[in-house]
Amino acid sequence: MKKLKVIALLICLCASFTFAEEYHWPRSYFASLGMGAQVSKGDFNERAISGKDTAGVKGYIHPPALEFIATPDLMLGVNLGAFSFAMSFQYWVSEQVIADFPDESYKQDTRIWRFGLEATYNLFYPEFFQVGFGLGYSYNSVKSDDIAIFSSDTYDAEFMGSAVAFIANIHYYITDNISMVPAIKIYESWFKNVHCSRVETNDLDPYLWQSFVLATVSVQYQF
């Protein structure tokens, strides 16, 4: 979270910086709301995590497989000439298969949220059709019900980590203020902590790595 605060501060400084008149960059703000679907592959699909509680009792935490997830995508940001800087937020709850569980059909409700910062450069600016490429950094949380098993008891568990994003999008301006924005975002994620009430918060060694590919279509309003 400290990294996110530093990056957010840098974005605010960039947005508020005023160039000399001959080097002035046009500035505008935007908000967008979209819907997308993402697929993922990685350690979440393959293995359970073993651990011990304070009494030395061994148990297992089974992560959700996260094979297919639908999610809204909310963004707020600023345009500085051909550059765009934004905060993004995604949140969704869906039923997911639990990986490496004795009952292969076992499913549980899984809550996934991601908060991040993105920076893109828009080719062909200021035309009505623009192609953007950029990078992002985000904080991720994945929580499922009853996936930690110690003896015969089950507990909720939450995986926490970060991700680097690679972004490609298209802006098609229907009017001067409204555009359609299809996008592809690839998140390379690492989860370094897991929390459940039986073991509190444990550092994961090695980390759990998971790749997400998210495709979205958004409506953006620029002002």
Q: How would you name each of these model-derived features?
A:
Residues 1-27:
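Cleavable N-terminal export/targeting peptides
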Residues 4-7, 138, 187:
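Residue-level detector of intrinsically disordered/flexible regions characterized by low predicted structural confidence
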Residues 12-15, 83, 186:
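Alpha-helical transmembrane segments and their juxtamembrane interfaces
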Residues 20-85, 214-223:
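Short glycine/proline- and aromatic-enriched beta-strand/turn motifs that initiate or cap beta-hairpins
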Residues 39, 72-151, 155-164, 172-176, ...:
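Gram-negative (and chloroplast) outer-membrane scaffold detector with strong preference
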Residues 44-48, 59-61, 94, 98, ...:
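Predominantly the C-terminal beta-signal and adjacent terminal strand-loop region
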Residues 53-60, 100-103, 149-154, 198-203:
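Extracytoplasmic loops and strand-loop junctions of Gram-negative outer membrane beta-barrel proteins
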